[in-house]
Regions:
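Extended, highly charged
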Residues: 1-78, 84-180, 184-212
Length: 212
């Protein structure tokens, strides 16, 4: 467990294409939580390393991660006659989990209905109860069998330029403004593995994963 000055640059995070903007975690299981319901979401959004304790999270506006960020940032007064939001909190807890049971990866990319948590679906796929545990520095539950867990928070409203990234279309995606994860802890198994995939024009590893 690294809580004092954690450093994600110690991890074997690859840079796969010459013009990529940096090193990217390409199989990240990003955990966020709805502040209203407490339900967790597991999504796969590429993560660019900015430094020892800063990571960009490439979640688009239609993804659950972005929806949870909006919910943390604002709350609507049910008695109000307008929909003007009121600022709730400046930070949102986030965890990036790497490795663990393969059903977690499938659950993170599956188009599940909003009322079905990825953790529950992963347990269904594995035909067993998925073991989860509390994160050590953030108010989140994370898979107990993950090889590596990067914990931190997003300062709501803070963005930095992420990219470019060699994508599955065969071109580099453009740079864009995305949230920054500030790392508060890194936990890992003693025999941790660091799974990764190379993204590019099919046929590539990520294409076979998508077909599966």
């Amino acid at each position: 467990i690294e809580k004092n000055n954690p450093d994600v640059t110690k991890l074997p995070i690859p840079k796969t294409w010459p013009l990529d903007g940096g090193n990217f975690i390409t199989l990240p299981l990003v955990v966020t939580k709805d502040p209203e319901t407490g339900e967790h979401n597991l999504g796969m959004y590429r993560a660019q390393i900015f430094g020892p304790r800063e990571i960009a999270l490439h979640w688009q506006i239609h993804k659950h991660g972005a929806a949870h960020a909006d919910a943390h940032a604002t709350i609507h007064d049910p008695s109000a006659t307008t929909t003007t939001p009121v600022v709730r909190s400046g930070r949102m807890p986030v965890a990036i989990c790497i490795g663990g049971p393969p059903e977690l990866v499938f659950s993170a990319i599956a188009p599940l209905p909003d009322n079905l948590e990825e953790y529950m679906f992963a347990g269904f796929l594995g035909r067993r109860r998925l073991r989860i545990t509390k994160a050590v520095t953030q108010d989140l539950c994370v898979p107990a069998e993950a090889d590596i867990v990067i914990e931190g928070y997003v300062d709501l409203g803070e963005t930095r330029k992420e990219g470019p990234f060699g994508d599955h279309f065969g071109f580099y995606s453009l740079t864009g403004d995305y949230p920054v994860l500030h790392v508060t802890a890194v936990t890992r198994r003693k025999d941790a593995l660091f799974p990764a995939t190379i993204v590019g024009q099919p046929p590539m590893e990520d294409g076979y994963l998508g077909e599966a």
